[in-house]
Amino acid sequence: GLISSYALCRYPEIFGGAACLSTHCTLAFPDPTQQDSAMMAAYRMYLKQHVPVNGAKFYMDNGDQTLDANYLMAQALINDMMYESGWDSTHYMYRFFPGTAHCEDDWRARLDIPLLFLLAEE
């Protein structure tokens, strides 16, 4: 997820979208008592500054098992930032998959969702 979001931010003229599955948006192994970190805030600001609102398609998701259990708060902050910045549902999609983990088997099981979103005509 991180490398896909970076590719879109860095080369928006090349990549028209990004599928960010189980994005490690905490950028570290977080302290669960910490509500927001400087690294998480910097990642959100980077996204906000480098991807034109509704200028590409951006898909993000996560589960709630293994590493993904740490992403819920950070992902909620990203979702808030995206919607407050004006992203619409044609260009930004977030999905939550309860009971799924940060692993290839779970990503494979839901790969159709980001692909259909990214490849759909506007």
Model-derived features: positions:
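Non-catalytic cap/lid and distal C-terminal segments of serine-dependent acyl enzymes
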Residues: 1-122
